[in-house]
Amino acid sequence: MGERVVPIVPDEARTFGMEGMFKQIGIYSSEGQLYEPEDADQVMWYKESETGVMLEEGITEAGSFAAWTALATSYSNHDLTMIPFYVFYSMFGFQRIHDLAWAAGDAQAKGFLIGATSGRTTLNGEGLQHQDGHSHILSATIPNCRSYDPAFGYELAVIIEHGLKEMYENKKNNFYYLTVTNERYIQPPKPKSKSIDKNIIRGMHRVIEVKEPKIRLLGSGAILNECFKASEILNDYGIDNEVWSVTSFNMLRKDGMETENENIKNPLSKDKKSFVAKSFSENDIPTVASTDYMRAYSEQIRPYMSSPYYTLGTDGFGRSDSREKLREFFEIDANNIVMTSAYALFKEGTLDKKEMQKIYKKCDLKRNKNSPWNE
């Protein structure tokens, strides 16, 4: 299968840590290397050759995506199945080439789009031009695009393996959009649950489980770590909680729509439950979701929630600052998750006024701060 895989980048290969491919597989050039590269004295020098595999297209997202589309439709146009991986700054994906992506979907393209350095607060220090907080919302407009925002390496591996099987073995006419980040954090081993792979693909799985939780936290991508921090703070206040890793709010929405549509068409049959409803049926408790994307991303599952549901997101323009400061500014960090949880429990009557105020004071709520989307 390896000879069919084609990595594609515009001009950010070193940013993505892909320079090791220069020497290992080479950069394709129809005329070979016609110059001595500036980094010729380095180990990972810029090596072009007629037998190169990697496509390094320069600063042209449209050209790079055109190459991806040619490879992604090669199975049909040339009876030669190829497996393209186009890796790019996630902000410069659908934001710039959405019409081409729509056309690729219409042409039944098959392959992987990797939105690297994703997340409005995770790619810190590069300002509003680079900080993506809405690519998953844009990807949701393309019917056969399957998009995921995994937090851990094992989730990414499961999704790619599933995608390969779906597209090339089961002949499904889909393509996949996956967001990954440049933030370093601990990668846990894959849980041993029999349903783990299936749940990752369906859109979410539980990563912290307790016997009688009072609040449920949902997180995706790098922001799942903020949920872990919030979980520990809540534990300090005696508030038991469970945490879920949401790999795709888009897929959860598709499942919810499909379930609802089937119920409407079969009014005399017992209504089926969406994956969200079934997963949360054990505990009818408030839920707080926090992501590195606009609130509209996590809002997609609200129709399928039976208990109070609160969403935190990165509505507004990006900023240049540290991740910690950006997450505080956009109100998606651990403290804001904890405060929202305290509010939900107070409104429900589970948390008394004194304890709620104590938590708010500890989390240093800035009452006079403008909402980030109004800044």
Indicate residue ranges for each PLM-predicted region.
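Thiamine diphosphate
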Residues: 1-188, 195-196, 250, 256-266, ...
